[in-house]
Amino acid sequence: MPAAALLDDFLAFTLAGEAPAERDGACAGGAVRWQWLGDGLLAFEPAAADAAARASVLVSAGVHGDETAPIELLSMLVRDFAAGALPLACRLLVVLGNVPAMRAGERYLDDDLNRLFSGRHAQVPASREAPRAAQLEAAASAFFAAAPAGSARWHIDMHTAIRASVFEQFALLPHTGTPPTRAMVEWLGDARIAAVLLHTAKGNTYSHFTAEHCGALACTLELGKVRPFGQNDLTRFAPADRAVRKLVSGERAEGGATLPRVFTVIDQITKQSDALELFVAADVANFTAFARGTVLAQDGDYRYTVKHDEERIVFPNPTVKPGLRAGLLVVDTTRDTLAALV
């Protein structure tokens, strides 16, 4: 298939499952060099020689194959700067994550790809997601290893959520052992992200991997509800899309944007067995608040009771496999977190 088809509609090209006739070339009137690195993997770099100051940005979508809106936005981003309609001012790696699941219209085929990073894929060698997790780790590692010394490194991993949320668009920041950076929190404010969830333990997500192993400023964005391809109202994603476009084109974020509220994980509900009961409505929204003393879950001898004056539940899901997280509990830490930004 001609390379023009790859750049004009990266999504359709990837879903078709073909390789381009050329694996690299130039676009945007010769201003940008591109390289196809494999299914759903495209690298770009400005042809100009000012590499020393150039940021390295990884933008990913489709780590869950049914989260279509960010995939569509990412394909349009590629189209626009390949055509010269949007300048490219950074090294850029564009990733469509779980391509077989995208083709099937499923979240995943065997295992949640976003739980298989930082080497966890080695524990499930029979999983159809395991080789892809290893491939995405290798691609990110090689991309950031080639970054100019001292230059900025970013990873924006875009998702949509299965359920509604008190805050329709929110972000998750991986645990790094240090406070969040002002650059990331201000970028999230510019993207009109209403809330940020801070993890307090290492995880196996894509953004955890790039933060810990590649030194990237990394976040997972939850940008709304899961819908089939072609059924998304992309205007609802416009602020986040604009912020990503500013990041890759080198445009400064607007000053004075409202910073998001910040919530910190204080516990999780882990599914011990198939007897787990969650005492919340099946359609409870992410960030729904519960008062001290409320019993939220029971699983055999295990019981989770709210310990703070107010805790909010995020990602409740009793259908996960035993041993996996069935819900996160968070508390509001906005004041202390914003005061400690670095």
From Swiss-Prot:
GO terms for biological process: arginine catabolic process to glutamate; arginine catabolic process to succinate. It is an enzyme of class 3 (hydrolase). Gene3D superfamilies: Zn peptidases. It catalyses: N-succinyl-L-glutamate + H2O = L-glutamate + succinate. Binds 1 zinc ion per subunit. Pathway: Amino-acid degradation; L-arginine degradation via AST pathway; L-glutamate and succinate from L-arginine: step 5/5. One of its GO terms (molecular function) is hydrolase activity, acting on ester bonds. The keyword Zinc applies. Its EC number is 3.5.1.96. PANTHER family: ASPARTOACYLASE, SUCCINYLGLUTAMATE DESUCCINYLASE. This is Succinylglutamate desuccinylase. It comes from Burkholderia orbicola (strain MC0-3). The lineage of its organism: Bacteria, Pseudomonadati, Pseudomonadota, Betaproteobacteria, Burkholderiales.
